[in-house]
């Protein structure tokens, strides 16, 4: 992809400074930009590393002339501009048009004329795939699955039977969609059930054997969802598991059976959402956050990294810690924990003082 810097500025809806005819063929970090590359220097610390005579993406308020640049694009929101810039120069996964001869496609499957399907892809009976689909090598798609328009499915993705996927969905390598939920039951009350009711007390420990509850529900992924590498979303037991429009899921995330995740959520790496949990819209779960089963996390909740949510979380709450509490409560608690050694020393000193007074008989 090659653009003039003026064309790139227009694409980003940003202000151009300097020579708009310069050719841009890529981007690089400040101090590493070569010929034809625009340097990313949206903070003063990065701007100091710029080489004179080049091109840069700068935050509004920077002085390109003082930095010795030939041209610059000035933006009000640098990270949003980064989204547009990286999109302009992303070559994509390079999946060749057409259907690779090694692909195994059931004759009842419906594929678009413009499909790009890589080597060793397996597509099952009655699958329907929308226009513009790009499917990389070693992907398997189970029977009766429906995939919308402009899907990008990277290598090694596994999609089980009866999954419904919307338009413009991106699935990164190793994603697993629609596997059976983790549902098991014992003939008698299990130890897990007992301690959940008693909050830790056990009457007796006895043998128990697990019986599988089969997963008859489906999985519904809405439009514009992105799912990171090696993440898994299980199908429902009776009703469908659902992921809402525009939600982005990072690598190594587990979403359990029957879960409902709302629209425009962010689930960062190593998040685990247990079965039948419901998550509202625009929720952000930081890395390693855990959500207990059968609870509700309200709209616009933000949970910091490694937070463990065991009970319902009201809308708009900012959470941190294990168990999850308001962020300000957690921060204050951590401050108090750091004060404990000093407090311990003060108490020890007071005890010693009182002991001396008692020994001298000055205190009754």
Curated annotation (Swiss-Prot):
InterPro entries for this protein: Hexapep (IPR001451), Hexapep_transf_CS (IPR018357), LpxD (IPR007691), Trimer_LpxA-like_sf (IPR011004)
Alphabetical GO biological process terms: lipid A biosynthetic process
Active site: residue positions: 257 (proton acceptor)
GO MF terms, alphabetically ordered: N-acyltransferase activity
PANTHER family (UniProt xref): UDP-3-O-ACYLGLUCOSAMINE N-ACYLTRANSFERASE, UDP-3-O-ACYLGLUCOSAMINE N-ACYLTRANSFERASE 1, MITOCHONDRIAL-RELATED
Subunit description: Homotrimer.
Annotated protein name in UniProt: UDP-3-O-acylglucosamine N-acyltransferase
């Amino acid at each position: 992809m090659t653009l003039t810097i003026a064309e790139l500025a227009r694409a980003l809806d940003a202000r151009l400074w300097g020579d708009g005819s310069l050719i841009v063929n890529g981007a690089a970090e400040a101090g590493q930009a070569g010929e034809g590359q625009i340097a990313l220097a949206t903070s003063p610390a990065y701007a100091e590393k710029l080489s004179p005579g080049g091109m840069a993406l700068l935050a509004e308020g920077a002085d390109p002339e003082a930095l010795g640049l030939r041209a610059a694009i000035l933006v009000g929101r640098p990270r949003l501009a980064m989204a547009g810039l990286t999109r302009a120069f992303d070559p994509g996964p390079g999946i060749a048009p057409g259907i690779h001869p090694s692909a195994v496609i059931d004759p009842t499957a419906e594929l678009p004329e413009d499909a790009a399907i890589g080597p060793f892809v397996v597509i099952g009976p009655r699958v329907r795939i929308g226009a513009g689909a790009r499917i990389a090598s070693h992907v398997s798609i189970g029977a009766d699955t429906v995939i919308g328009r402009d899907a990008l499915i990277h290598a090694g993705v596994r999609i089980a039977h009866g999954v419904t996927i919307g338009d413009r969905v991106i699935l990164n390598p190793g994603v697993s969609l629609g596997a059976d939920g983790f549902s098991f039951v014992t003939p008698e009350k299990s130890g897990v059930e007992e301690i959940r009711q008693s909050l830790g007390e056990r009457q007796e420990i006895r043998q128990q054997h697990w019986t599988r509850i089969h997963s008859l529900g489906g999985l519904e992924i809405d439009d514009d969802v992105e799912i990171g590498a090696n993440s898994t979303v299980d199908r429902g037991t009776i009703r469908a598991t659902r992921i809402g429009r525009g939600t982005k899921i990072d690598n190594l995330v587990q979403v359990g059976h029957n879960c409902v995740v709302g629209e425009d959520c962010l689930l960062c790496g190593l998040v685990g959402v247990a079965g039948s949990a419901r998550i509202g819209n625009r929720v952000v779960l930081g890395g390693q956050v855990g959500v207990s089963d059968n609870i509700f996390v309200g709209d616009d909740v933000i949970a910091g990294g490694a937070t463990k949510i065991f009970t319902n979380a009201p809308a708009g709450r900012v959470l941190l810690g294990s168990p999850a509490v308001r962020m300000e409560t957690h921060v204050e608690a951590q401050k108090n924990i750091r004060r404990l050694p000093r407090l311990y020393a003060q108490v020890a000193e007071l005890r010693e003082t009182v002991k001396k007074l008692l020994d001298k008989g000055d205190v009754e």
